């Protein structure tokens, strides 16, 4: 056996020290303590931030939501079946970001911005944070430009302005999604970009919506964000924020955008599930204490921003333009109960609500808008001039009709004035009916409202109101195309337009059939 003298031993040690690779990487790493139901508990992450992305082996990511004294609770974004106790978990120092930009228009993406429509990668897109602070009061501008939904009942009585938050609320299966989709279809030539966020819906339902948007030429102008019912609660919770970030891209660059959240009830349920699994204390209806903040921080991001904000954001690249993000959140009620926890929260956050009623829907009045309890708190200032002028008596007529109709059931004989009011109300109710996927232009709508407001429907049978309206619009678009184009472009109402519409309707009634 070879003997080593002390000098050789010291030389070997020196050589090893000289050749030692001492380059080290400082990182914050912990150990997975438990994995269950999409929730991971991690021990040993010292400097983790709230909402920070956490990396697990195999390219799986999570999001830190509970920062406790000796552990961190995180939700896994995606499949968690590969994770096991004892695995390492690393902090990334980043918060969740999603792709943004015009490359997303016409595409269907998941809650993390990955394309799921089979049309290939998105291309060169920027990314932006999912959680952002809403613009401050100083940077905002008042709402004074309209978003035309194409629905007579909405644009006449409950107008929506650019930068407004207008809630669509009602029971299941009474046309909430149909109304929102029609509003998106009506924007295809308006220059407003659209984002449709589907939360907790069946994939077949979403596929049908995408097909309808494509058939009506509106998909090229729309981003569809999907967190279906089969996906994790974490993705259903994040999808509205991801969609909002994609919409803010347009707002911050001086463009106008419209976002539909379908629906926030399912997002609240997903957040409740996450919170209960994270062992947070439950409150009313088992929702966590911050469920109001869940929706308020999302809906406050919908706003109209000033020219100065856009100029500052784009570093002077865009000047003299305001930007807006208009939100149409949808809430599903149970048996018409708007006093439940989530509906009351969202009603108090938004700038008005469109209330859809089951009884009206079942009696064939579609869209089933209850004009009495629906309201738009800021949209009046944004309403098109001609629609504002002609719609004044419509809401009153409907409100009086509903009141008198209930009274008339018990009264045997009615005086002449009451009978006329009832008949006028019936005709206006019939006129407010509208087919799905058939949004109306400003001129078409003005024509219908003019006929109702100026008494041209008095001698038309109630059963024939719909066919009268269709024939009238077709006649004007054929024989008075110049007048219709003028109304559509300017939206003004003056003596010349008044006289033109009046003469046209009189001639139509004298010469045409319906």
Curated annotation (Swiss-Prot):
Under catalytic activity, the entry for this protein gives: ATP + H2O + 4 H(+)(in) = ADP + phosphate + 5 H(+)(out)
Give the matching PROSITE patterns.
Answer: ATPASE_ALPHA_BETA
Q: Which NCBIfam families does the protein's record reference? A: atpA, PRK13343.1
Residues the record annotates as the site (Required for activity) are: 374
Q: How does it assemble?
A: F-type ATPases have 2 components, CF(1) - the catalytic core - and CF(0) - the membrane proton channel. CF(1) has five subunits: alpha(3), beta(3), gamma(1), delta(1), epsilon(1). CF(0) has three main subunits: a(1), b(2) and c(9-12). The alpha and beta chains form an alternating ring which encloses part of the gamma chain. CF(1) is attached to CF(0) by a central stalk formed by the gamma and epsilon chains, while a peripheral stalk is formed by the delta and b chains.
Entry binding sites for ATP: 170-177
UniProt EC number: 7.1.2.2
Q: Does the keyword Oxidoreductase apply?
A: no
* Its biological purpose: Produces ATP from ADP in the presence of a proton gradient across the membrane. The alpha chain is a regulatory subunit.
Please give the family membership noted in the entry.
Belongs to the ATPase alpha/beta chains family.
An annotated Gene Ontology molecular function: ATP binding
Stated membrane topology is: Peripheral membrane protein
Q: What class of enzyme is it?
A: translocase
The identity of this protein, by name, is: ATP synthase subunit alpha
List GO terms (cellular component aspect): plasma membrane; proton-transporting ATP synthase complex
Q: Does the keyword Transmembrane helix apply?
A: no
Which keywords, in A-to-Z order, does the entry hold? ATP synthesis, ATP-binding, Cell inner membrane, Cell membrane, CF(1), Hydrogen ion transport, Ion transport, Membrane, Nucleotide-binding, Translocase, Transport
């Amino acid at each position: 056996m070879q003997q080593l003298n002390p000098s050789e031993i010291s030389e070997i040690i020196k050589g090893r020290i000289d050749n030692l690779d001492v380059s080290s990487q400082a990182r914050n790493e912990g150990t997975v303590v438990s994995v269950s139901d999409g929730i991971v508990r991690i021990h040993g992450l010292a400097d983790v931030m709230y909402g920070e992305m956490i990396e697990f082996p195999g390219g799986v990511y999570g999001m830190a939501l509970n920062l406790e004294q000796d552990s961190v609770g995180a939700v896994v974004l995606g499949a968690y079946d590969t994770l096991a106790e004892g695995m390492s978990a690393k902090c990334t120092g980043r918060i969740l970001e999603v792709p943004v930009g015009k490359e997303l228009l016409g595409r269907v993406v998941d809650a993390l911005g990955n394309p799921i429509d089979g049309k290939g990668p998105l291309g060169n897109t920027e990314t932006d944070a999912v959680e952002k602070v809403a613009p401050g009061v100083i940077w905002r501008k008042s709402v004074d430009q309209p978003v035309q939904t194409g629905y007579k009942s909405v644009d006449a009585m409950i107008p929506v302005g650019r930068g407004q938050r207008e809630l669509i609320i009602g029971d299941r299966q009474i046309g909430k999604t149909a109304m929102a989709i029609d509003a998106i279809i009506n924007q295809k030539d308006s220059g407003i970009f659209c984002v449709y966020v589907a939360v907790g819906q069946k994939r077949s339902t979403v596929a049908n919506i995408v097909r309808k948007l494509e058939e009506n030429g509106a998909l090229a102008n729309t981003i569809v964000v999907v967190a279906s019912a089969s996906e994790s609660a974490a993705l259903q919770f994040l999808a509205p924020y991801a969609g909002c970030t994609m919409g803010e891209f347009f707002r911050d660059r001086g463009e106008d955008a419209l976002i539909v959240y379908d629906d926030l009830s399912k997002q609240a349920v997903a957040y409740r599930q996450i919170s209960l699994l994270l062992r947070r204390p439950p409150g009313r209806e088992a929702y966590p204490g911050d469920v109001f903040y869940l929706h308020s921080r999302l809906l406050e991001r919908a706003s109209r921003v000033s020219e100065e904000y856009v100029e500052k954001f784009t570093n002077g690249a865009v000047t003299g333009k305001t930007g807006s993000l208009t939100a149409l959140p949808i809430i599903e009620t149970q048996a018409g109960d708007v006093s439940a926890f989530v509906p009351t929260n969202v009603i108090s956050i938004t700038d008005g609500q469109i209330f859809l009623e089951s009884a009206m829907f079942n009696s064939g009045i579609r869209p089933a808008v209850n004009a009495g309890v629906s309201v738009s708190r800021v949209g009046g200032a944004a309403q098109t001039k001609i629609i504002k002028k002609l719609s004044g008596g419509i809401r009153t007529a409907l409100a009086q009709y509903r009141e008198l109709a209930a009274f008339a059931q018990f009264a045997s004989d009615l005086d002449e004035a009451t009978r006329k009011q009832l008949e006028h109300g019936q005709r206006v109710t019939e006129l407010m009916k509208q087919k799905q996927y058939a949004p109306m232009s400003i001129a078409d709508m003005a024509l219908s409202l003019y006929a109702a407001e100026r008494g041209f429907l008095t001698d038309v049978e109630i059963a024939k109101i719909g066919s009268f309206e269709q024939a009238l619009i077709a006649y004007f678009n054929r024989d008075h195309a110049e007048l219709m184009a003028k109304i559509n472009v300017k939206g003004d109402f003056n003596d010349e337009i008044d006289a033109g519409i009046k003469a046209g309707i009189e001639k139509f009634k004298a010469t045409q059939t319906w």
